[in-house]
Amino acid sequence: MVHPIQIGKRTRMSFSKVKEMCPMPNLIEVQLNSYDWFWKEGLNEVFDDVNPIQDYTGNLILEFIDYNLDKDAIKYSVEECKERDATYAAPLKVKVRLLNKETGEVKEQEVFMGDFPLMTQQGTFVINGAERVIVSQLVRSPGAYYGYDVDKTGKKLFSSTVIPNRGAWLEYETDSNDIIYVRIDKTRKLPISILIRALGLGSDAEIVDWFGEEERLKATIEKDNTKTREEALLEIYKRLRPGEPPTVDSALSLINSLFFDAKRYDLSRVGRYKFNKKLAIYIRLLNQVAAEDVVNPFTGEIIVQKGETIDREKALEIQNCAINAVNIQVEDKVIKVIGNNFVDIHKFIDFDISDLKIKEHVHYPTLKNILDNYTDEKSIKEEIKKNIHELIPKHIVVDDIYATISYELGLPYEIGTIDDIDHLGNRRLRSVGELLQNQFRIGLSRMERVVKERMTIQDQEVITPQALINIRPVAAAIKEFFGSSQLSQFMDQTNPLSELTHKRRLSALGPGGLSRERAGFEVRDVHHSHYGRMCPIETPEGPNIGLINSLACYAKVNEYGFIETPYRLVDKKEARVTDEIVYLTADEEDHYLVAQAKEPLDENGCFIDEKITVRDLEDVIVVSKDQVDLMDVSPSQIVSVATAMIPFLENDDASRALMGSNMQRQAVPLLKPAAPIVGTGIEYKAAVDSGVLPKAEHDGVIEYVSSTEVRIRRDSDGGLDKHKLLKYKRSNQGTCINQRPIVSKGEKVKAGDVLADGPSTDFGEIALGQNIRMGFITWEGYNYEDAMLVSEQLVRDDIFTSIHIEEYESEARDTKLGPEEITRDIPNVGEDALKNIDERGIVRIGAEVRSGDILVGKVTPKGETELTAEERLLRAIFGEKAREVRDTSLRVPHGEAGIIVDVKVFTRENGDELPPGVNELVRCYIAQKRKISVGDKMAGRHGNKGVISRILPEEDMPFLPDGRPLQICLNPLGVPSRMNIGQVLEVHLGWAAGEMGWHIATPVFNGAFEDEIVELLQEAGYSEDGKTVLYDGRTGEPFDNRVTVGYMYILKLHHLVDDKIHARSTGPYSLVTQQPLGGKAQFGGQRFGEMEVWALEAYGAAHTLQEVLTVKSDDVVGRVKTYEAIVKGENIPEPGVPESFKVLIKELQALCLDVKVLSDTNEEIKIKESSEEDMEDLGVNIEGTEDEIVPTAEKRSSNQDEEALELVDNEEFEDIKLEYDDLQLDELENGLELEDFNDEH
């Protein structure tokens, strides 16, 4: 039944039935742990890979000995980096030793290897002032994979791929004639016997002896035209290096460098682990019948007798006795099974070698060699340490290749298993640390080339490590990764949940991953191995569906990059669930039967029911209670954090739950956050781990609290901890980040307690929206198509008001004609426009600005023109002041307004780092309060989204019997077809809880049942169906039917109408077509497209159509003349020829086609090449520079075009600002606008 639980400072009444056994791990540990690993181990591995660098003679040797990150030399703190557009980084220093073999001279130096970006405590990076997140990548794990195709006759043709981390692939395939082929590194296929011969088994007899007499192998040997090792080597060389003269030596060295050279072929630790797991002999021996006695080579005992079935224990014993080949009886055939000769080192060494950190199996021949030659512990340990790379080779070895071939040969006899590449046991995570390591490796290998070149060129006497090493390639590789990699993303900072989700995101895209176009349905689909590891719900809609996923709540990533999930162990003898918790990867879990977390237990933890429902791979089956191996730790372990925040998720349709999870991430932080009445209990954990809340570092007592700072007196040593709070900072998405304290002076706090609320949090719980009193009722059609009818009270009381902060910057540069200047002295600007500008020329903080207001006054030198006599006189009298400058001030863009909350000025004089050519940089921050308005998008947590259609006066809204009006009316038709019934249960529970003053926690799959809600409704004094009589606010009459009413948690999403609506009369035009640009950012127009033209044609509205396609679009002369005619009140003149038509003619002429335009009477119509002359006469400049009006042509002889000059009466232009070609190219992102390129935009 319902019971109280304490979450932070708030008590919630919880409906959970299952007590949580396992605490949720830190939700951003994926990021933090991976980055830590990089500094502790990852970087070391890279240096080990390149050590030592030798010159071509082998005389000079360069070694990297040690490295350290100088955290004391960090230039700016995180906050300063954001302010100054800097990167939060620390210098990496590497100790380098140079050895000259001839002279025996050794030089050691510490070399600076560039600034390395540091991760903040929140798991983000600050790159060039912007917070970025490195998303983890899901990739195929290196290993050996087996599959099959079916040919026309229904016969299974087995194939296999051996995939390294980097290096040449080996692919085996069988054709319908039972011949096995191999492809080496994607080249043409060869019979597999050629590869076997080349690896050392030259003759047919040797091959058959080694692999056993197998039909397909014999057929392959017959097909093979080589008979010796030498012939095979030459054959392979011809295939891999066509056109080069083949020799046996070059063929040998080619194979060695392709497969057995650690620099060219890298399996990585994961690959070695997967190889040993797949190719180990014991897995294939399970449940097979031995064809002969298997004898322990050390003791001579018989492990398995002929004809005996091999069980798990016997199979393991065979493996641990280093027996690498066993004959198996399959019906009437004898099949030889060969392993890859790797063993568990602890079975052969009886003393402690834990300090060597050997977790993988080791290569037995190498180990045997050491054990045969040494006997005492110390020297064995030394040798193992020395030969660690031979014991655990990072490249493939001949034994591995033989084992992969043996596996392929055994598959038709059901020895071995087929792999599923979408199984999470075969997909792993590359997190920040590994991605960084790969980048660093690329940089270092480029640097290695430079070092080798310099070694040969420079004088060997005076050479130093510093002179050899060029850090450019390393620094460039790292910079490129953080700046432009697909996996380095601009952090989604809309609210704390979106931050958290972004850090826990898993992407299958990116370098070395899949591409959207190639990814099929299987990769995207939910797989049974996702259970407890990846969320089956949260993924984007659209082309990325299933390729971008989210980590489940309890999931962890192990050292190999596989995702693990926790389970409780079951004691099978007593059928008792213990409190012991194990973390399992997907392929380990496959061997067990797992019960669900809600399975009822008695007080001793034993199963109550005799029959238990369990998961077995993708099936759900019922077994007796003594067969269960494991039990889930929590019902919410299968979903991600965002999905776990949806109450009654179990009553929602999956596709709507997906929308609900995604839309919570788009909720805008509101002015007064309110935690949900009906929550799930995970809100606190999510907010605390997201990193937006300041937490106490130590136990202590609050000594001082203000709106900007909290100070804590530590209990341990009496010292003082100071926590600065963020005030009105702009997030990446333009929402407002503001923290306010929730502790008071004298309060005792424990380490980890929340000190202040941030954006969208309420008492340390995530609070994305508001609890709104609503009813499912239609109202005058304003609910059509999911629209929402809202009460004016939401506007008046600022319930859905949010603060948005925009940043505008202006820089004063050096131009060819002189430096730009930031000043208050702007030409042709009245004093009225400068009322908020200070003496420096910058707007004052606190000023209210509207669109078009000046933020930063700036003037740019103009080209010197021929001066008239009067001007020369003025120059002579007043000096330089009368020089030509142009007003290029920063103004508030169209449709923006607000209050200046901050201004930052960076100058060269103050020692700020500015880009080259920039002397001064000014940034203004404008904050605006956005109240809820018609057209804003709102949503619940169950995927029920809609747009506000009307804001109704409070007195007209439907009201309850006690007189309280509803705040929102939703359409009841939105529920049944969408099957998200969770929202109805939320409304009922919220109605009861709201009345009783409770906050509720109803965890997913573990929450309130229908009868519990009914009980609570009765307790609160409401009808048990949750419905009530509603009265019409306009007439006071009751509605015909009773209506479901209650409290629903509603979010305001980031799709605000203010950001989307805009209006244009005239504005910038595209340079080529002279048509208006498109989109709000370019201040564009509405495109009158193909279909709209058809519509006007269908109506026969010829003149309207002509006008739309000419003077309203790209008839340059006609545009101006029409404007004139409107201004002077005359009739609109005839349209001219559209510019796009001229462009079309030019394009046809570019194809060498002679195009003429003919009239009805077949006479050629001359189309003027350029309308520049007309334009100049009209006083319009079509080049699209910033000067809107060209001065009327005074330099011409007066008789030339008298009437053209008469057209333009200068005085009339004083008050009309023509904006035809206001196209300031430098202000558009890429110069020409997007329509000019056939891009995907």
Curated annotation (Swiss-Prot):
An example Gene Ontology CC term for this record: DNA-directed RNA polymerase complex
EC class of the enzyme, as a word: transferase
Signal peptide: none
The UniProt record lists the keyword Glycosyltransferase: no
Catalytic activity as recorded in UniProt: RNA(n) + a ribonucleoside 5'-triphosphate = RNA(n+1) + diphosphate
Acidic residues compositional bias, start-end: 1200-1210
Any Pfam family the entry gives: RNA_pol_Rpb2_7
InterPro entries: DNA-dir_RNA_pol_bsu_ext_1_sf, DNA-dir_RNA_pol_bsu_external_1, DNA-dir_RNA_pol_su2, DNA-dir_RNAP_su2_dom, DNA-dir_RNAP_su2_hyb_sf, RNA_pol_bsu_bac, RNA_pol_bsu_CS, RNA_pol_bsu_protrusion
Region ranges (Disordered): 1186-1210
GO molecular function: DNA binding; DNA-directed RNA polymerase activity; ribonucleoside binding
EC number: 2.7.7.6
Quaternary structure and interacting proteins, as annotated: The RNAP catalytic core consists of 2 alpha, 1 beta, 1 beta' and 1 omega subunit. When a sigma factor is associated with the core the holoenzyme is formed, which can initiate transcription.
Physiological role: DNA-dependent RNA polymerase catalyzes the transcription of DNA into RNA using the four ribonucleoside triphosphates as substrates.
Family as reported in the entry's similarity comment: Belongs to the RNA polymerase beta chain family.
Name of this protein: DNA-directed RNA polymerase subunit beta
The species this protein was found in: Clostridium novyi (strain NT)
Gene label: rpoB
